[in-house]
Amino acid sequence: MLTSHFPLPFAGHRLHIVDFDASSFREHDLLWLPHHDRLRSAGRKRKAEHLAGRIAAVHALREVGVRTVPGMGDKRQPLWPDGLFGSISHCATTALAVISRQRIGIDIEKIMSQHTATELAPSIIDSDERQILQASLLPFPLALTLAFSAKESVYKAFSDRVTLPGFNSAKVTSLTATHISLHLLPAFAATMAERTVRTEWFQRDNSVITLVSAITRVPHDRSAPASILSAIPR
C-alpha cells in the first residue's frame, strides 16, 4: 500500500502521521502484522485503515527504541510494550499514532457538515455544552466535531479503566482556539469523577486532531487552570 509518513511536534509530543492510498492496498500487505489472521474477515477499507495505523505506530515506537508492531487485544485494542502508552486513530486517508510514558489519547475526525452537526448534536452534547460551543465563536460544525473528538481522545486515554462511557459522561467546560476542557462525571468512572481534562487540538485541512495526555488531580473549578499541559501556539 502506498503511504507517506511525517512526524509533527504537538503539545509536547511527536505525532506520526501516515497518509495512505487505500486503493493501492493488497492483501499481502498485511502479512508483516503478527495478528494478520485476525483481520481476515474485515473489509478492504478496514484492513487498509488498520495497516496505516500500525505503520504510524511502528514509527512512533521507533522513537523510543522499540522495533515491534503493536499486537491486538481481545477488544481489538493496540497492545503496547510494558511501560509505554500509545494511541492510534484514522480518518479517511490519514492515520496517526503517538507514544508516551504516561496515559495518552489521540483522535482525528473529519469536520462535520452543517446538516450532520445539527442531526448529531443532541447525542453528543447537552444544552449547557451547546452554549459553551456557541460562545467560542467557532463555526458550530467545527466546535461540535471538536467536542466529539475530545471525548473520543479522553476515552482512548483511559480505555483500560472504563467501559464504553457515553458522550454524556464527560462535559465540555471550555473551548478555545487551542484546547477544549472536559469535566468527567461519575458515569465516566467513579474513581475519576469531578476531574478536569484539557485536550489540545488543531485543524489539518478538513479534519481536526485532538490529544489528551494529562488529567488534573483537583476537583472541577471553572476559575482554576484546567491542565498541566501548556497551550500550543497556532
Swiss-Prot record:
InterPro entries found in the cross-reference section: 4-PPantetheinyl_Trfase_dom, 4-PPantetheinyl_Trfase_dom_sf, 4PPT_N, Enbac_synth_compD-like
SUPFAM superfamilies: 4'-phosphopantetheinyl transferase (SSF56214)
Gene3D superfamilies per UniProt: 4'-phosphopantetheinyl transferase domain
Binding residues annotated for Mg(2+), in chain numbering: 107, 109, 152
Pathway stated in the Swiss-Prot or TrEMBL entry: Siderophore biosynthesis; enterobactin biosynthesis
Name by which UniProt lists this protein: Enterobactin synthase component D
Stated role: Involved in the biosynthesis of the siderophore enterobactin (enterochelin), which is a macrocyclic trimeric lactone of N-(2,3-dihydroxybenzoyl)-serine. The serine trilactone serves as a scaffolding for the three catechol functionalities that provide hexadentate coordination for the tightly ligated iron(2+) atoms.
GO MF entry, a single one: magnesium ion binding
NCBIfam families recorded: PRK10251.1
Cofactor(s) listed: Mg(2+)
Family to which this protein belongs: Belongs to the P-Pant transferase superfamily. EntD family.
UniProt keyword list: Enterobactin biosynthesis, Magnesium, Membrane, Metal-binding, Transferase
Reactions this protein catalyses: apo-[aryl-carrier protein] + CoA = holo-[aryl-carrier protein] + adenosine 3',5'-bisphosphate + H(+); apo-[peptidyl-carrier protein] + CoA = holo-[peptidyl-carrier protein] + adenosine 3',5'-bisphosphate + H(+)
Record field: transmembrane: none
Swiss-Prot/TrEMBL GO biological process terms: enterobactin biosynthetic process; siderophore metabolic process
Enzyme Commission code: 2.7.8.-
GO (cellular component) term, any one: plasma membrane
Enzyme class label: transferase
Quaternary organization: EntB, EntD, EntE, and EntF form a multienzyme complex called enterobactin synthase.
